[in-house]
Amino acid sequence: MYYAIDVSKWQGAVNWASVKAAGIRHAMLRAGYGNSAVDPQFKRNAAQCTALGVDWGCYWYSYAASPAQARQEARCCLQVIQGLKPTMPVAYDIEYEPCILALDNATRTAMVQAFLGEIEAAGYYGILYASKDFIQNKLNWRELTAYDVWCAQYGSACTCPLPYGIWQYSSSNPLGIPGYGTSLDCNRVYKDYPQIIQDAGLNGWIASRPDKPADTEDNSAPDASTKYQLVTIGPVSTGDAMTLMRLCEQLHLTNQGLYRSAWADKPAGTQTLTIGPVSSGDAWRIMRQCLALELTDHGLYRSQYVE
């Protein structure tokens, strides 16, 4: 677990050197809001975080009133972050705006799916930001189990009904970042997002190859050799193997002979899976399932580009 702050124009010109000196090396930055508004501090925040080695992601505050409008917000967000290569997720921030509260749960849920679907289709790691109350009472949350969650719930515990990777636990600066008194959002983060994102080749990064460290950036021009990945998973339980096989069936990989399993030497009764070569999009879908199964947390998901 590590800590992160989230900021927008309301924090003014953040002194990122001071933030880093206080021990904070991860941040979520507001990229913008609504149909096309860019946060006036975003470019500066992203540039300074990158220069100082502070891992950052971003969020887009929604004013959408339909799935189509949420999809357009996602496209605007993608335009704003194009070429910046964040190492933390890209979040859909849905809150209690009147235009959103006027909708029913089904429409709000479809908006989440539309925004995050657009983000993921572009090769970015998407995450839902909402309060625990909003998730539980304003969304059909059981339909959102495929997505990672950044949950806001202030207090000593998070009781979000969905598994979450980030918990916004306070808005009163309990981390004591200089210059913000008792007004700064603070978060506990439970996944190694920079490693996950760079290993999977998301957010504009090139997936790590066996002859390079996982965090090495490949600036070579893309070609046919960088379009497909070989995925190795395991050792995993038979139940997890069956879950992944069903996903591969849905992706039409099994009927092409691209899903292979073998019994592992140990632990007894476990399997090692080899999947591919598959497109980067399919590799991302497989990795997302592995995230849900908590396999990535134990280093059981590995991928590499193949010729």
Regions found by a protein language model. Name each.
Residues 1-116, 120-125:
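Substrate-binding cleft of extracellular glycoside hydrolase catalytic domains
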Residues 78-92, 96-98, 139-163:
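Structural recognition of alpha->loop->beta junctions
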Residues 56, 125-127, 149, 255-256, ...:
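Hydrophobic anchor at the start of a short beta-strand
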Residues 108, 122-128, 145-153:
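Extracellular glycoside hydrolase catalytic/binding regions
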Residues 59-63, 218-307:
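Solvent-exposed beta-strand motifs enriched in subsets of small alpha/beta binding domains
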Residues 1-11, 17-18, 142-222:
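Functionally critical loop-and-helix segments that line ligand-binding/catalytic clefts
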Residues 119-137:
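Aromatic-lined carbohydrate-recognition surfaces of secreted/lumenal glycan-active proteins
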Residues 69-72, 134-144:
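Glycine-rich, charge-decorated loop segments at or immediately adjacent to ligand/cofactor-binding or catalytic sites
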